[in-house]
């Protein structure tokens, strides 16, 4: 019962870190990155579909992304979706593919993005702590119902705290890495 609660908590914490990693990857760093477009969707025959499923995305140069739709009739829709996104880029359509030049970030914009990265990191840490809280409640329930002894639950709580600290540290490292990327000129 205790092992099950700890395993479940660790699995959920792992997912929270993965979500944080994905969220941070969508923040533009001033360098071309296919991940920038991972959350942009277009209306594809009535269904919201990710651009990554409708086109190949390549980075031939440090500040250039080339998007080649699998279907030529989707060029205009993809271009419009990118233009309307919050990426702050201006795509150009040459009839066969879309080129997106990634502009240099201003110092002000870098600071803004660092704040955004820290906020996303904080949200992820709150998520991990909530998972810990729920697991602690489960451990207290196990103790109360007599399914495990006081010592067993105490050890499990220490293990849970150690695991929580490990995942919070991972999130801090992800944010620190992203901050370094953003502030690098």
Curated annotation (Swiss-Prot):
GO terms for cellular component: cytoplasm. NCBIfam families: frr (TIGR00496). Transmembrane segments: none annotated. The keyword Protein biosynthesis applies. The gene is frr. InterPro entries: Ribosome_recyc_fac, Ribosome_recyc_fac_dom, RRF_sf. It is found in: Cytoplasm. This is Ribosome-recycling factor. Belongs to the RRF family. Responsible for the release of ribosomes from messenger RNA at the termination of protein biosynthesis. May increase the efficiency of translation by recycling ribosomes from one round of translation to another. GO terms for molecular function: ribosomal large subunit binding. It comes from Mycobacterium bovis (strain BCG / Pasteur 1173P2). Keywords: Cytoplasm, Protein biosynthesis. It comes from the Bacteria. PANTHER family: MITOCHONDRIAL RIBOSOME RECYCLING FACTOR PSEUDO 1, RIBOSOME RECYCLING FACTOR. CDD domains: RRF (cd00520). One of its GO terms (biological process) is translational termination.
């Amino acid at each position: 019962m205790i092992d099950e609660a700890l395993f479940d908590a660790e699995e959920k914490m792992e997912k929270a870190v993965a979500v944080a990693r994905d969220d941070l990857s969508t923040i533009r760093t001033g360098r071309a990155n296919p991940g920038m477009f991972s959350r942009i969707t277009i209306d594809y025959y009535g269904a919201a579909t990710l651009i990554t499923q409708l086109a190949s995305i390549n980075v031939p140069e440090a500040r250039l992304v080339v998007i080649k739709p699998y279907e030529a009739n989707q060029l205009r829709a993809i271009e419009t979706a990118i233009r309307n996104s919050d990426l702050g880029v201006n795509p150009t359509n040459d009839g066969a593919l879309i080129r997106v030049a990634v502009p240099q970030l201003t110092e002000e914009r870098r600071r803004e993005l660092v704040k955004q990265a820290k906020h996303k990191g904080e949200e992820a840490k709150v998520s991990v702590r909530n998972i810990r809280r729920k697991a602690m409640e489960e451990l207290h329930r196990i103790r109360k119902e007599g399914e495990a002894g006081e010592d067993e639950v105490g050890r499990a709580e220490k293990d849970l705290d150690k695991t929580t600290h490990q995942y919070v540290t991972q999130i801090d490292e992800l944010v620190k890495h992203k901050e370094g990327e953003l502030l690098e000129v």
